[in-house]
């Protein structure tokens, strides 16, 4: 369950930012993750709740947004979402119909999008 280590990192960043800005109360944090990260949102929520209990961050709301997998065909430069995300190594481009290399444009990210503080 790598969500626990991700939450530990998130909380460290949040506390550092709050300290730098003289803020005491976190109301909400929004994180974004890509489809390829294998993050389980419920596990992320659970770890966030457990790790914030009894701290100044307790009661803060964690919002989670999934970023879809988007690929760019190296032949025609078309941007597309594969139908079967389990077989991304053997994909035919829906535009040029060639089975060629592609670049992952989105789907691997994990970041804090914003914090709401008091």
UniProtKB/Swiss-Prot annotation:
Signal peptide: none
Coiled coil, from the record: none
Pfam families xref list: HypA
Assigned keywords, A-Z: Metal-binding, Nickel, Zinc
An example Gene Ontology biological process: protein modification process
InterPro entries linked: Hydgase_Ni_incorp_HypA/HybF_CS, HypA/HybF
Binding site for Zn(2+): 73, 76, 93, 96
Keyword Endoplasmic reticulum on entry: no
Binding site for Ni(2+): 2
UniProt GO molecular function: nickel cation binding; zinc ion binding
Function: Involved in the maturation of [NiFe] hydrogenases. Required for nickel insertion into the metal center of the hydrogenase.
Family listed: Belongs to the HypA/HybF family.
Name of protein: Hydrogenase maturation factor HypA
Organism of provenance: Lawsonia intracellularis (strain PHE/MN1-00)
Organismal lineage: Bacteria, Pseudomonadati, Thermodesulfobacteriota, Desulfovibrionia, Desulfovibrionales
């Amino acid at each position: 369950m790598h969500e626990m280590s991700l939450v530990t990192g998130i909380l460290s960043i949040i506390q550092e930012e709050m300290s730098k800005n003289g803020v005491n109360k976190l109301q909400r944090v929004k994180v974004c993750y890509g489809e390829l990260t294998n993050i389980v949102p419920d596990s992320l929520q659970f770890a966030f709740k457990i790790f914030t209990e009894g701290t100044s961050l307790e009661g803060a709301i964690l919002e989670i947004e999934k970023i879809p997998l988007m690929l760019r065909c190296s032949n025609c430069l078309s941007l597309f979402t594969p139908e079967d995300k389990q077989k991304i190594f053997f994909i035919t481009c829906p535009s040029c119909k060639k089975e060629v290399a592609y670049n992952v444009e989105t789907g691997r990210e994990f970041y804090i999008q914003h914090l709401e503080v008091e």
